[in-house]
Regions:
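Short, cationic-aromatic polyanion-contact patches
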Residues: 3-5, 60-79
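Conserved segment of winged-helix/HTH DNA-binding domains
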Residues: 71-96
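Short alpha-helical segments that sit at the start of domains
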Residues: 1-14, 18, 74
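Short, hydrophobic-biased segments on the C-terminal half of alpha helices
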Residues: 43-47
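C-terminal regulatory/oligomerization modules of transcriptional regulators
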Residues: 101-126
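Short acidic, hydrophobic short linear motifs in intrinsically disordered regions
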Residues: 21-30
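Short helix-coil junctions and helix-kink-helix linkers
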Residues: 29-37
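Glycine-centered, phosphate/nucleic-acid-interacting loop/turn motifs that mediate DNA/RNA or nucleotide
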Residues: 53
Length: 126
């Protein structure tokens, strides 16, 4: 799937929150606080997202219903891998170093990361 714009990502976040198809009016209502969109603008972005393979539009009824074709987890993996490859030469260590040096990691984050790595080590995983 092609990379999503910030606006497309915001739409996906709303779709991921729902376990059922969502109408464009529902999307517009739920995104109202974030963006001051008109319905036509939203429809244009949704059409672009469908072309990218991010959403499916069910047109079998009078009202169009939209569902995410990519799970939130799949998108995070794709984007995270892309960032790691492009910016950090595939080095998780360099990525973590950047987070730490830029004060993006709290003591709690560090503790949780240590616990996670210990768990992986105890299981014999990567």
């Amino acid at each position: 799937m092609k990379k999503l714009s910030e606006a497309e990502f915001e739409i996906m976040q709303v779709l991921w929150q729902h376990n059922e198809p969502v109408t464009s009016n529902q999307l517009l209502e739920e995104m109202g606080d974030n963006r001051n969109w008109k319905l036509a603008s939203l429809m244009t972005v949704l059409a672009r997202m469908a072309e990218k393979g991010a959403v499916h539009c069910d047109r079998s009824t009078r009202t169009n219903y939209y569902t995410a074709l990519v799970s939130e987890e799949e998108y995070k993996i794709t984007e995270g891998t892309s960032i790691l490859e492009r910016l950090f030469n595939k080095s998780a260590k360099d990525f973590i170093t950047m987070l730490y040096q830029s004060d993006r990691m709290s003591e709690k984050d560090l503790r949780e990361l240590r616990e996670y790595l210990d768990t992986l080590e105890n299981k014999g995983e990567k």
